[in-house]
Amino acid sequence: MAQQEVVEGFKFEQRHGKERVRVARVWKTRQGQHFIVEWRVGITLFSDCVNSYLRDDNSDIVATDTMKNTVYAKAKECSDILSAEEFAILLAKHFVSFYQKVTGAIVNIVEKPWERVTVDGQPHEHGFKLGSEKHTTEAIVQKSGSLQLTSGIEGLSVLKTTQSGFVNFIRDKYTALPDTRERMVATEVTALWRYSYESLYSLPQKPLYFTEKYQEVKKVLADTFFGPPKGGVYSPSVQNTLYLMAKATLNRFPDIAYVSLKLPNLHFIPVNISNQDGPIVKFEDDVYLPTDEPHGSIQASLSRLWSKL
């Protein structure tokens, strides 16, 4: 998105913004139920302010403190509950429409996973606890109204105690890992998916559409990893499982054009301990040493043939 310019005989690109703007917004219904979101917002603006770099002329700059204030002002204006995606688009649209010199904006948001608590089997009106995985989004908006919207998950920790193996890989003089058709598999999923909407005018109008989609994608990813509740599904490698998770996402959601997954292979090492008198701990698929350093790193992306990505 950045426009390259030639200044004083050099190629020059620039952008500026504000990072780690933390905002929480509470909505209260007439029935007494409260809703809360907590977001960490990052803003990047592309604008015609080259004079601020070349000379003492700041007249074209949107101050980063102004960007910060705008986050709180726009949060205040949102009288209805909205998704992180909707707020990111709202902010980006504001910056490109409100400021003549701004040609494009990137707004990224990480949502802290506050979840409503249940007390005595009933959802609490205003009580929340912190969950684990985080909802992320990035909206890229240009003055023309073009849009690129990406959502994601960070820190989705999943584990299977069986139904995983790894055999017939390349062996050489450096290989010590034995073949196995029975192992534990664990990972912390980082997922990104890009929607096919290419303009501000083509977005779904259903309230909280993207929040629902986030929950649905998370379920598809987890269900594909685990398999059916009775018996599960065998994983011959993290690579194969990753591909099946990405494919299931594209097959399930026609308005998603691209999926990227990163699945670190978090190891559970079988424990065998012996001394001169014999075994102290004999491994029988029961006692493990959990470790995430070092760990395998498996990542891939999948997109539709017509996708521009």
Swiss-Prot record:
The active site is at residues 18, 64, 267. The keyword Lyase does not apply. The keyword Repeat does not apply. One of its GO terms (molecular function) is urate oxidase activity. CDD domains: Uricase. Pfam families: Uricase. A motif (Microbody targeting signal) lies at residues 307-309. Its EC number is 1.7.3.3. It is found in: Peroxisome. GO terms for biological process: nodulation; purine nucleobase catabolic process; urate catabolic process. It catalyses: urate + O2 + H2O = 5-hydroxyisourate + H2O2. Pathway: Purine metabolism; urate degradation; (S)-allantoin from urate: step 1/3. Urate binds at residues 64-65, 166, 183, 238-239, 265. Keywords: Nodulation, Oxidoreductase, Peroxisome, Purine metabolism. Expressed predominantly in the uninfected cells of the central tissue of the root nodule. The N-terminus is blocked. It comes from the Eukaryota. Induction: During nodulation in legume roots after Rhizobium infection. Catalyzes the oxidation of uric acid to 5-hydroxyisourate, which is further processed to form (S)-allantoin. Homotetramer. Belongs to the uricase family. This is Uricase-2 isozyme 1. It comes from Glycine max (Soybean).
